[in-house]
Amino acid sequence: MLGWTLMFLVIAVIAGLFGFTGIAGAAAGIAKIIFFIFIVLLVISLVANAIRGKAPRA
């Protein structure tokens, strides 16, 4: 689950870079929303794994 979260976070960051630099100005709003959604999902995933006491998979 954490792997999926990190993968989508990377995709959102890349989309955000394109949006914030003006390459795809129309997608900037969507990229911002996706970026913050996946930041929240990453934090939730990290907290859930910490509470369960599981070590991250390599």
UniProtKB/Swiss-Prot annotation:
Entries under InterPro entries matching the protein: DUF1328 (IPR009760)
Transmembrane domains' residue ranges: 6-26, 27-47
Keyword tags: Cell membrane, Membrane, Transmembrane, Transmembrane helix
Superkingdom assignment: Bacteria
Topology of this chain in the membrane: Multi-pass membrane protein
Covalent S-S links between cysteines: none
N-terminal signal peptide: none
Protein family according to the UniProt entry: Belongs to the UPF0391 family.
Protein name per UniProt: UPF0391 membrane protein Sfri_4000
Organism encoding this protein: Shewanella frigidimarina (strain NCIMB 400)
